[in-house]
Every structure is written in structure tokens, then in C-alpha cells.
Amino acid sequence: MKITKVKIEKFSAPLKEPFRVAFGVIEDADSWTVKIETDEGIYGLGSAAPLAFVTGETMDTCYIVMKMFADAFIGFDPMDIAGAHKLMDSIIYSNGAAKCAFDLALYDIIGKKKGLPVYKVLGGTDPVVHNDITIGINAPEKMEADAKEYVFEKGFRILKVKVGNDASLDALRLTSIKKATPAGTVIRVDANQGWTPKQAVRI
């Protein structure tokens, strides 16, 4: 099997409300989608979600790198994951979002070729993904209200709570959410590099 065509398209979705984290505010969910087609009619889909302060990539730079990959992958065997990683690394260092999109699309092709879901291709045994939902930085009462909505109305049992812009206020945010949710609710704390090591230990 050989790769015959690679398509890259932009996807943008406005968020219901601005999403605040320690390093900034995000108002739109922007990403690139890649579709890798093969000579056997099997195709794979992948997605790149670059964020400059996380991956060092912007939407523009990510597209440029993905175009480089797209040209290099024509004629390549999509079943060769190790070779694909070596090829991408030989083209450019880092750029994890762009590489992720192609990695995902190739695994999608492999799964379809083998007639298996990707989690089994990767050696997994549990078909259920236990996901969290993220609560952005806001006033403590707003974050508490969001936590209640996600747990009691939407059924989430794992909350990822963004903090990091004010350590003293962060403690109040986390305490409020902990008190407002039932025992057994998993709370993951993500300060996005906004705390010092001492603050992290103290909180």
C-alpha cells in the first residue's frame, strides 16, 4: 500500500465562552485536519491543534510544516509508523502538533487495514475512554457552578481545573470545587506553569 494524496484543511470553532488559562485567553478552537489517501482506497484522518505557548507552533507555521510532510509522504508505505517518524524527524525538529496529525492519520489507516480499532492496534484492551472536562480560570463561584453542572447535569466524574494566575485565589477555587462535588470526583489540577515549585507544594 502506498500514499497517493494528502489533503490539509482548516477547522475553526468559536467557543461558547472565552477559555482562560494561566498564560492567556483562548476564544476559538483552531486546528488543521489531514486526510491521507492510499492506492487501496483506504484513508486516514488526523488533527493538529497548535498552540504557540504550548507546542511552539502557530496555525501558520503548523500548516507550512504539514505541507512539507504532505509532499514527503507521497509514495510512502503508511503501515511503516517507525519509518514515518524518522521521515518527519529528518525534515524538521520538534513541531509536535504537525507530527501528531500525520501519526494519527497513519494509525487510522493501519486500523482500517487490519480491521481493528486503533486502541487494539496499540495493544489496548479497554474500549472505553474515561475522559475529563476542563474548567477554565474564572471567579471561584463561576468555577464552582461549572463543576456542579458538569458533575450533576452532564455526568462527568473527572474534572481538570485550570489555575495559575493567582495562587491564593487558586486555593479558594479548588476548595470550592472540592466541597461542591461528591466524594469520588477526580480533580486534576493544571497550573500551566503559573505556579512556582513552592506554591505547587503548598497548595
Q: Where are the regions that the model predicts?
A:
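Structured beta-strand/loop patches that form or line metal/cofactor-binding pockets in enzymes
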Residues: 1-54
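N-terminal amphipathic alpha-helix/helix-capping segment at the start of soluble metabolic enzymes
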Residues: 1-10, 21, 112, 116-127
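Conserved active-site and cofactor/substrate-binding residues in soluble primary-metabolism enzymes
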Residues: 29, 60, 64, 79, ...
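Structured loop/turn residues at beta-strand edges in well-structured enzyme cores
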Residues: 1, 100, 154
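Metal- or metallocofactor-binding catalytic centers and their adjacent structured scaffolds
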Residues: 5, 37-113
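Hydrophobic side chains within alpha-helical segments
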Residues: 33, 106, 111, 173-176
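Broad gene-expression machinery/nucleic-acid interaction feature
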Residues: 31-33, 101, 130, 158
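Metal-dependent enolase-superfamily TIM-barrel catalytic cores that perform enediolate-based chemistry
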Residues: 120-203
